[in-house]
């Protein structure tokens, strides 16, 4: 099941990808574990539920349906048939394979409107995507809470190395957002890594920090 899941998340899990030493983006082949090739990181925030376009895997992994069953992507999706070609109630039938009770009498035949609502992504404007975090809808809070950064999390590998974590923070800083927290976190993980592996990333760290004296 894990190997099958890795095929899907090679494309449907995008974020800050850190290749393992000696690996390239074309090295992954079906039947291999994606974590043997790369670690894919996404930021976690407290009081924030937004997500990027290609985060189907990340969102699904946060679902109770996924965590409490043997559910995979192909439990609902036929990889050889476009969702545009399936019958209208195809996905609702998939839900009803496990769930046969709906308390909302007005939407007894449209599970996805409530539990996988369409919303926008934070990285691509003017598109809508079904949120793959299958959940019971909560009442919308009128109180706006501060979004607090928790850290970068490897979605496909529960035990990434410290050098992988450090490289993820450096890449995040360089490619997405010049947040000093990323550099601080990178420095912490670099100091937890073997010096022989960390040396190139230390050079990148000092360059991004504009500490050119330390590069000499």
Regions flagged by a language model, labelled:
Residues 140-145, 209-215:
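Alpha-helical linker/edge segments of TPR/alpha-solenoid repeat scaffolds
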Residues 185-188, 192:
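The canonical alpha-helical register within tetratricopeptide repeats
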Residues 186, 215-216:
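Tetratricopeptide repeat
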